[in-house]
């Protein structure tokens, strides 16, 4: 009994570690993107620019990023639909085999 419980604990810990690693990878990726964004912004901004020009650049960048977010949302929806279809196919296959 103890060995089964220990096995379950180890599996749960392994899954927890996997989720933590994935979370840290996302944080690393997000922070790298922020650094890249700031570097890009520094390239666009010039000393003699007006406030309005700077705001225009920022608004254009914001619009580009919002478009990307929308694209990713659509892609995730498509992937989710495909995953559900595959799950249904697997479930139906298992029923037919049993």
Swiss-Prot record:
Disulfide bonds: none
Domain of life: Bacteria
Signal peptide: none
Key word Oxidoreductase present: no
Any matching Pfam family: DUF496
Coiled-coil ranges from the UniProt annotation: 7-34
A single cellular component GO annotation: cytosol
Keywords: Coiled coil, Cytoplasm
Cellular localisation: Cytoplasm
Purpose of the protein: Pole-localizer protein involved in the regulation of several cellular processes.
Entry's family note: Belongs to the pole-localizer TmaR family.
PANTHER family: UPF0265 PROTEIN YEEX
Protein name according to UniProt: Pole-localizer protein TmaR
Organism: Fusobacterium nucleatum subsp. nucleatum (strain ATCC 25586 / DSM 15643 / BCRC 10681 / CIP 101130 / JCM 8532 / KCTC 2640 / LMG 13131 / VPI 4355)
Lineage: Bacteria, Fusobacteriati, Fusobacteriota, Fusobacteriia, Fusobacteriales
Gene, per the UniProt record: tmaR
């Amino acid at each position: 009994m103890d060995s089964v419980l220990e096995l379950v604990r180890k599996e749960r810990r392994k899954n927890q570690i996997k989720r933590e690693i994935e979370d840290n990878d996302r944080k690393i990726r997000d922070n790298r993107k922020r650094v890249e964004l700031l570097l890009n912004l520094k390239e666009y901004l010039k000393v003699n620019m007006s406030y309005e020009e700077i705001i225009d650049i920022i608004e254009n960048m914001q619009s580009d990023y919002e478009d990307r977010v929308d694209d990713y949302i659509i892609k995730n929806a498509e992937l989710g639909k495909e995953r559900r279809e595959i799950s249904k196919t697997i479930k139906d296959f298992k029923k037919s085999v049993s």
